[in-house]
């Protein structure tokens, strides 16, 4: 058995180089919610040195709120936004001799696309039009994944180690009870259950089927690095290999 571990990097958290030793895929901020050209260049350099798969992490234009504020943005504008950000990171990756592997939307853009098919189609169209060989990372079991598949893209269904789930398989909204697992043991147990049993316990106590193909480890928490080490060790002890795959 194998699983991909991904983390959102280039966001100014100061632990990117160390995290890259523990993950298999990196989602690099493209300057619209965090980071800038210099951080993109440096993060790509570190990722290439570690052999980590590199992905673009496009967002709404929202540096003030770290891309976590929902916007009512025209789908054509979103298409252009995402296309622009993918192109910027791709140029940096190519300049250093690498190849862009995937795209994962960030924050509010990601969460809204789970609920809004027009938004999901705009994001997916930008990815496909840029390079139809890119892998699309999206919330496991969501319509965002369905839209990407319908467009002919390869997908990785993403689960979250430290986030709470609703009974419909969506993430509990940040700022509400149960949104984040502060207890590392709870997060570790949830991750192992999702990977091995392909299910997750929702906040109402029900079990929800879930397809875990890549696990997101948030890189911006106070204990992100220590948790990443623990989850890697726990997966290894269970005989689960960590690789990006195709």
UniProtKB/Swiss-Prot annotation:
The keyword Hydrolase applies. It catalyses: 5-oxo-L-proline + ATP + 2 H2O = L-glutamate + ADP + phosphate + H(+). Its EC number is 3.5.2.9. One of its GO terms (biological process) is carbohydrate metabolic process. Signal peptide: none annotated. Catalyzes the cleavage of 5-oxoproline to form L-glutamate coupled to the hydrolysis of ATP to ADP and inorganic phosphate. It comes from the Bacteria. The lineage of its organism: Bacteria, Pseudomonadati, Pseudomonadota, Betaproteobacteria, Burkholderiales. It is an enzyme of class 3 (hydrolase). Belongs to the LamB/PxpA family. This is 5-oxoprolinase subunit A. Forms a complex composed of PxpA, PxpB and PxpC.
């Amino acid at each position: 058995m194998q699983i991909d571990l991904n983390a959102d990097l280039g966001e100014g958290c100061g632990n990117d180089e160390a995290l890259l030793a523990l993950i298999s895929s990196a989602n690099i901020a493209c300057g619209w919610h965090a980071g800038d050209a210099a951080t993109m260049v440096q993060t790509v350099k570190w990722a290439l040195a570690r052999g980590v798969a590199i992905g673009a992490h496009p967002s709404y234009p929202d540096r003030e709120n770290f891309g976590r504020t929902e916007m009512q943005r025209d789908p054509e504008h979103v298409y252009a936004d995402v296309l622009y950000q993918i192109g910027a990171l791709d140029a940096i990756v190519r300049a250093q001799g690498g190849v862009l592997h995937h795209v994962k939307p960030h924050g509010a853009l990601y969460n809204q696309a789970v609920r809004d098919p027009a938004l999901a189609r705009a994001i997916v169209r930008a990815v496909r039009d840029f390079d139809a060989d890119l892998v699309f990372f999206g919330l496991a079991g969501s319509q965002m994944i369905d839209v990407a598949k319908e467009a002919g893209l390869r997908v990785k269904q993403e689960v979250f180690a430290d986030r709470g789930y609703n009974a419909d398989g969506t993430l509990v909204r940040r700022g509400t009870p149960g949104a984040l697992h502060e207890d590392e043991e709870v997060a570790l147990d949830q991750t192992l259950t999702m990977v091995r049993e392909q299910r997750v316990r929702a906040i109402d106590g029900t079990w929800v089927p879930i397809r875990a193909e890549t696990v997101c480890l948030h890189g911006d928490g106070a204990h992100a690095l220590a948790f990443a080490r623990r989850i890697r060790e726990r997966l290894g002890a269970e005989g689960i290999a960590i690789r990006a795959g195709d």
